[in-house]
Amino acid sequence: MTVIAKIYAREILDSRGNPTLEAEVTLENAVCGRAAVPSGASTGTKEAVELRDGDKTRYLGKGVRAAVDNVNGVIAAALVGFDGADQTGLDHRLINLDGTENKGRLGANALLGVSLATAHAVAAARKQPLWMYLSTLGESKLSLPVPMMNIINGGAHADNNVDFQEFMVLPVGFASFSEALRAGTEIFHALKSVLKGQGLSTAVGDEGGFAPDFRSNVEALDAILEAIGRAGYIAGEDVLLGLDVASSEFRNNGKYNLVGENKRLTSEQFVDFLDDLVAQYPIISIEDGLAEDDWVGWKQLTERIGHKVQLVGDDLFVTNPKVFQEGITSGIANAILIKLNQIGTLTETLESIAMAHRAQYAAIVSHRSGETEDTSIADIAVATTATQIKTGSLCRSDRVAKYNQLLRIEQALGVGARYAGRDAFVSLKS
């Protein structure tokens, strides 16, 4: 029933108007699964390779015809007749078929599209929603994740002068995901009013957050605090704050260059800067606080505030189990961001989440800045031991689609639905 009969890929557009790959896997019983692959703007140097054509006369060189051809050719030839229910076996066959450490021959976008589409197909064949099927593939908790809502965009995600890439609200003080989502939405709309009142732009960035020209990163935090209050919530109780510093993007010649603050800081000084922010604001999570190659700085940051703040490795770990294990062994960070296209298969993604759970690191399932209407990450966040999800702001359909899928899952779980809330950070001490 779950033997693969056909594999097909096509070139579609992502939320930035760039080409990406969509794969379809059809089983012998004619059931079909479909998945689309996202794309990042700020990327870690150790990420799996996203295969682009490089033909400047077509889509400015960003076409993915080669990856599509790889799916329709060598990958389809190798997997037609394979039992899609053997997800681990299928993914290992994909990895071996590529034969490179970084999936650079066939492309991580080609491999991931097929890997995810197969899971969708098998779930449909079993008449199960994806989250229910995925819960049978590994460690599972079936709880609704805390949304890390990116309501102000900066850095590589916006054309403004804000250094930090994301300013997020985390609605932790609520009994259900739906209530948390409502709170985040109301704060988002309150923030729009705050920005208008300050004469600032309410245009949005790649991930749906506002992208005004604040004079500093601290100004952005102050605006969010005002919005939380205007919406009728209490910062530090109902809602906590999160940052994606994406510091690799503004580190040059060993110094962290903060344009708004007019500062060029050493690693030690930047650790002090982040520590001061945590003391002044109800910040519970900092992602990529130090550059991906600044492991000495990461160690200092972890020792300084890792007991009370979630320190998330994104560019640092790139969802790669080998790199992640080095970080665990070294005592670097205490959480990992899970981006499927950083590693390239569903099995490796689930392995990274399971590794985090065993090491008592938090796992956050994440979108990319170039997204599609695909909602797979919502199902993965519910089905695994991940406690949080990053899928952007409260506008743009490519972001809201994931939130809406989580609402559907919460309703499907009924009285058994559990929202992670503050329990997502139970290992941290105030």
Swiss-Prot record:
Binds a second Mg(2+) ion via substrate during catalysis. Coiled coil: none annotated. The active site is at E207, K339. Keywords: Cytoplasm, Glycolysis, Lyase, Magnesium, Metal-binding, Secreted. This is Enolase. Belongs to the enolase family. (2R)-2-phosphoglycerate binds at Q165, K339, R368, S369, K390. It catalyses: (2R)-2-phosphoglycerate = phosphoenolpyruvate + H2O. Mg(2+) binds at D244, E287, D314. GO terms for molecular function: magnesium ion binding; phosphopyruvate hydratase activity. Its cofactor is Mg(2+). Catalyzes the reversible conversion of 2-phosphoglycerate (2-PG) into phosphoenolpyruvate (PEP). It is essential for the degradation of carbohydrates via glycolysis. GO terms for biological process: glycolytic process. HAMAP family: Enolase. It comes from the Bacteria. InterPro entries: Enolase, Enolase-like_C_sf, Enolase-like_N, Enolase_C, Enolase_CS, Enolase_N. It is found in: Cytoplasm; Secreted; Cell surface. Component of the RNA degradosome, a multiprotein complex involved in RNA processing and mRNA degradation. Gene3D superfamilies: Enolase-like C-terminal domain, Enolase-like, N-terminal domain. Pathway: Carbohydrate degradation; glycolysis; pyruvate from D-glyceraldehyde 3-phosphate: step 4/5. The keyword GTP-binding does not apply. Transmembrane segments: none annotated. Its EC number is 4.2.1.11. GO terms for cellular component: cell surface; extracellular region; phosphopyruvate hydratase complex.
